[in-house]
From Swiss-Prot:
Organism phylogeny: Eukaryota, Fungi, Dikarya, Ascomycota, Saccharomycotina
Organism: Saccharomyces cerevisiae (strain ATCC 204508 / S288c)
Miscellaneous remark of the record: Present with 15600 molecules/cell in log phase SD medium.
Cellular component per GO, a single term: cytoplasm
Biased composition, class Low complexity, residue ranges: 15-33
Alphabetized InterPro entries for the sequence: KH_dom, KH_dom_type_1, KH_dom_type_1_sf
Name of encoding gene: HEK2
Biased composition (Basic and acidic residues): 370-381
Record note on quaternary structure: Binds RNA.
Protein name per its UniProtKB record: Heterogeneous nuclear rnp K-like protein 2
GO molecular function per UniProt: mRNA 3'-UTR AU-rich region binding; mRNA binding
Function: RNA-binding protein involved in the correct localization of transcripts in the cell. RNA localization is a widespread mechanism for achieving localized protein synthesis. Required for the asymmetric localization to the daughter cell nucleus of the ASH1 transcript, coding for a specific repressor of transcription. Overexpression inhibits translation of the ASH1 transcript. Involved in the stability of transcripts such as the MTL1 mRNA. Involved in structural and functional organization of telomeric chromatin and regulates silencing at the HMR locus.
Predominant subcellular localization, coarse grouping: cytoplasm
Segments for region (Disordered): 1-34, 344-381
Biological processes, Gene Ontology terms: 3'-UTR-mediated mRNA stabilization; chromatin organization; intracellular mRNA localization; mRNA stabilization; mRNA transport; regulation of translation; telomere maintenance; telomere maintenance via telomerase
Length: 381
C-alpha cells in the first residue's frame, strides 16, 4: 500500500490577545499567519542546506521575504554568505521550538510557489541536477498515487535539515521505530543521507511533505534533539560551504595553515557558554565562521576547574572575533550571577533589619509600660 501524504495544520502556542481581536490563526500552509509562541519554550537552532536559487527565493526582493518570515514568527534567520564557486548556502533559524518549526514551514511554502509567468523555467528548476550531490533530492518526487487530492500535488515540498551525526541515531530510533512513527503520524517521508557533508560530522535529514506536516514533524525532531543527552560536542565539526582543493579533497577547518587560539573557561560557566542543546556555541561558530572545539575533561586533568575551548579558522580576524565574543559571553554570565548573588544578599539583609526593628519596637513597648504605671502612682499620691 502506498504512503499517503497528509496535510496538517501546524501546532502553535496561543498568544495572549491584548488587542481585543481573535486569537485564532493558522499558518502559511493553511492561508493565515502562524501563531507565535510568547510563553517560555525550549530554543533550537536548525540549519538548512539550500541551493543558490532557493536562497535567493527565500531572501526575496531587497530581503522582503526573509524579513517577513522573521517578523511573523519571532525568530532569528540568517543565510550564509555566497562563496564564489560554491552552489550551496546555509540557512540558520533560531528561536523557540514551535516558532522555528513554523518559520521553516513558511520557507517550504515560499519554495513551493511557482512563477505563473514562466512555467517552463519552474519545471526546469525543479528537475535541475547539481554537481554538489547533497543538493539533489534523496527522495523521489511524489506520485499521483501517494496523494488523495491531486490539486495539492504542487503543495508538497522538501527540507534538507542539517543534523549532527550524534543525533541521527536518536531520530531514527531502535530498528527505525522512531522515524517510522514520525512518518506514519504526520504523513511525510523522511530519509537520512548515508554520506557526511564535506569536512564535517553532519548529515542531511530530508523531509518531504506539506508545509504544515513538515512543521509538525520538525517540532518532534527538535524535542528529540534537545532531549538527546549523549552528545559528543567536543569532536563534532559543523559544515560550511567551501571549495575543494585541487586534489579533490575538501578543505578542512583544521588544516595546519589555520589560526588557533586556546581559552580556558571556568568549569562553572561551561554549560552556560555552550547553551542548551549547544545552541549558543553553534550560533557563535556560525556567526564567526570558525570551528570551536570544547575538550572533554580527563580524570587526570590538572586543571579540573577549567575547560579548554579551541578556536580555529583560516582567517585570523574570525578567530579574534570568536575569542572576544566568547569572553564577552563569559563576562556577561559572571556579572549576571554576581548581580543575582548581590540581590539575594540584599534581600537577606533587609529581612534581618526588619526583624531587628520589630524586636526593638517590642522592647521599647515593654519598657514604656512600667513608666506609665509609675506616673499614675505619683498622680494618685
Amino acid at each position: 500500500m502506498s504512503q499517503f501524504f497528509e496535510a496538517a495544520t501546524p501546532v502553535a502556542i496561543p498568544t495572549n490577545n491584548t488587542n481585543g481581536g481573535s486569537s485564532d490563526a493558522g499558518s502559511a500552509a493553511t492561508g493565515g499567519a502562524p501563531v507565535v509562541g510568547t510563553t517560555a519554550q525550549p530554543t533550537i537552532n536548525h540549519r538548512l542546506l539550500l541551493s543558490l536559487k532557493e536562497a535567493a527565493k527565500i531572501i526575496g526582493t531587497k530581503g522582503s521575504t526573509i524579513s517577513r518570515i522573521r517578523a511573523a514568527n519571532a525568530v532569528k534567520i540568517g543565510i550564509s554568505e555566497k562563496v564564489p564557486g560554491c552552489s550551496d548556502r546555509i540557512l540558520s533559524c533560531a528561536g523557540n521550538v514551535i516558532n522555528v518549526a513554523n518559520a521553516i514551514g513558511d520557507i517550504v511554502d515560499v519554495l513551493n510557489k511557482r512563477n505563473p509567468e514562466n512555467e517552463d523555467a519552474a519545471e526546469g528548476e525543479a528537475e535541475e541536477h547539481y554537481y554538489f550531490h547533497f543538493l539533489n533530492h534523496i527522495l523521489p518526487a511524489p506520485s499521483k498515487d501517494e496523494i488523495r487530492d491531486l490539486q495539492q500535488l504542487e503543495d508538497i515540498g522538501y527540507v534538507r535539515l542539517i543534523v549532527a551525526n550524534s543525533h541521527i541515531s536518536s531520530i531514527i530510533g531502535k530498528a527505525g521505530a522512531t522515524i517510522k512513527s514520525l512518518i506514519n503520524k504526520h504523513g511525510v517521508k523522511i530519509v537520512a543521507s548515508k554520506d557526511f557533508l564535506p569536512a564535517s560530522d553532519e548529515r542531511i535529514i530530508e523531509i518531504q511533505g506539506f508545509p504544515g506536516s513538515i512543521t509538525n514533524v520538525l517540532i518532534e525532531i527538535s524535542e528529540i534533539i534537545l532531549s538527546d543527552v549523549d552528545v559528543r560536542f567536543s569532536t563534532e565539526r559543523s559544515y560550511f560551504p567551501h571549495l575543494k582543493k585541487s586534489s579533490g579533497e575538501p578543505t578542512s577547518p583544521s588544516t595546519s595553515s589555520n589560526t588557533r587560539i586556546e581559552l580556558k573557561i571556568p568549569e562553572l560557566y561551561v554549560g552556560a557558554i555552550i547553551g542548551r542543546g549547544m545552541n549558543r556555541i553553534k550560533n557563535l561558530k556560525t556567526f564567526t565562521k570558525t570551528n570551536i572545539v570544547v575538550e572533554r575533561k580527563d580524570d587526570d586533568d590538572k586543571d579540573e576547574n577549567f575547560r579548554k575551548f579551541i578556536i580555529t579558522s583560516k582567517f585570523p580576524k574570525n578567530v579574534k572575533l570568536a575569542e572576544s565574543m566568547l569572553l564577552k559571553n563569559l563576562n556577561t554570565e559572571i556579572e549576571k550571577r554576581e548581580n543575582y548573588k548581590r540581590k539575594l544578599e540584599a534581600a537577606e539583609g533587609d529581612a534581618t533589619v526588619v526583624t531587628e526593628r520589630s524586636d526593638s519596637a517590642s522592647f521599647l513597648e515593654e519598657k514604656e509600660e512600667p513608666q506609665e504605671n509609675h506616673d499614675n502612682k505619683e498622680e494618685q499620691s
